[in-house]
Design a protein with these regions (language model features):
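C-terminal catalytic core of tyrosine-transesterase DNA break-rejoin enzymes
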Residues: 3, 81, 98-122, 129
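Flexible coil/turn residues that form the inter-helical turn or adjacent wing/linker of helix-turn-helix
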Residues: 4, 68, 90, 108
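Conserved tyrosine-mediated DNA breakage-rejoining catalytic core shared by Y-recombinases
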Residues: 4, 9, 13-50, 125
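ATP/adenylate-binding site constellation spanning eukaryotic-like Ser/Thr protein kinases
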Residues: 16, 41-45, 75, 99, ...
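Catalytic-site neighborhood detector that most strongly recognizes the C-terminal catalytic loop/helix
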Residues: 32, 125-147
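Active-site/catalytic core of tyrosine-dependent DNA strand-transfer enzymes
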Residues: 41-89
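Catalytic tyrosine of NAD(P)H-dependent dehydrogenase/reductases that use a Tyr as the general acid/base
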Residues: 91-95
């Protein structure tokens, strides 16, 4: 979630054929069956290749022990567990990672329209939810750096 910003529903639907290794992209089907292409880093591509080969995956990227597509509650529980192991935040969910993806992109200078496209938002207003963190960051910088703050 953090690396791509995809939704939980999109993650569990990823099939091996959706990954274009040579283009370093992954195709996801978002809300209202809207398809979008997500870029992936070389490190993620290499990791995916190892993961797919190690588990001998054929159809879906994420499966249960029996080889069936994972269900949302299982992914939610795993994400919640691992966030709890590395962080003390109270909100522990796949959406928190998606939110963090968008916030970090914005805070590091990404154009809000590009973030909108990466997240698969139909309207910019949905993406603007993430700008509040940037406003807080600006307030902090202002308070720290301005002599009359």
């Amino acid at each position: 979630f953090y690396v791509t910003g995809i939704r939980l529903s999109e993650l569990i639907d990823i099939q091996i054929i959706d990954i274009e290794f040579y283009k370093k992209t992954i195709k996801v089907l978002g809300k209202r069956n809207k398809e979008r292409i997500i870029p992936l880093s070389e490190v993620i591509i290499k990791t995916l290749k190892i993961f797919i080969n190690e588990y001998k995956l054929k159809d879906f990227l994420f499966t249960d022990i029996k080889g069936n597509k994972v269900y949302p509650k299982l992914v939610y529980r795993v994400v919640k567990k691992y966030i709890g192991m590395i962080s003390s935040i109270n909100k522990r969910s796949p959406h928190v990672l998606r939110h963090t993806f968008a916030t970090h992109m914005l805070n590091n200078g990404a154009d809000i329209n590009a973030i909108k496209d990466l997240l698969g938002h139909a309207n910019l207003s949905a993406t603007q939810v993430y700008t509040h963190n940037t406003v807080e960051k600006l307030k902090s910088i202002y308070k720290q750096a301005h002599p009359r703050a």
